[in-house]
Amino acid sequence: MAFDYAVLGRKLKDARESLLISPQDSSSYLKISLQNYLDIEAGRNRITGDQLVLLAVLYRRDFRYFVTGDYPSAESQVQEMFRRNAALSKSDRVAIQEFVRLCEYEDFLEREIFQRQSVSLPNYRQFSFGHRYFKRQGEEAAIFERERLNLGTQPIENIFELIRNQGIHIFKRQLEDKNISGLYINHPVINELLPGHCILVNYLDDLYRQNFSAAHEYCHALFDSFQGQEITYLKLPNGDKNEWRANSFAGNFLVPKQRIELDYSPAKN
């Protein structure tokens, strides 16, 4: 069957537009005329192999996504994230796309080189809490998760290491939007049988907020992986119950109430 250059062109155009890259920048990057580049996106001009590899680098994609019709990727999740968060800057979009590639690279190394086995996380959305109070669900899930991991009542010293040990890909990247705390993506390539959990934490934040954001996104992995993606903002939308739950989980997971009561209860005479 003949290769469909029109489909390739549409993929290239979607990838370029998702990162807010102009056709002029792309043509300049390839050192070809603007019209020649537009003809590539329109499927009228056949792209060369080296040009395709260069564009894959520029657009932060795996080149196989462009040339394979059924190549699995997180493209739909990322595009949906950008669509729902249209105000994302060009640099933040690039940082997010680079984060996705880092997760893919890490997954390849862990599976193919280090033979790491997949870890199955509990899906607390399927758990029967017996009530619909989201903040309380977050607190109770934190208790269940600490029990599952045998954490006792001690504060978590390294939340990033703990999350990585659960088979989750987690990275810190600098995002220029200071209102973004972190984000979660369920990557279909990283784990074909289980959710491919990927977490990004904004490196611009102080360490305390980074730790809280990591635990917050961990809650989204435990509850909300079916949504495919989400971005967490410091200033939460009113009425977002999933974010209430994730905040409640994060605080109680990092430092349980029992520890606070033990360490800071008023001294008795």
Locate each region found by the language model.
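Short juxta-domain linker segments that transition from a proline/glycine-rich
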Residues: M1-N269
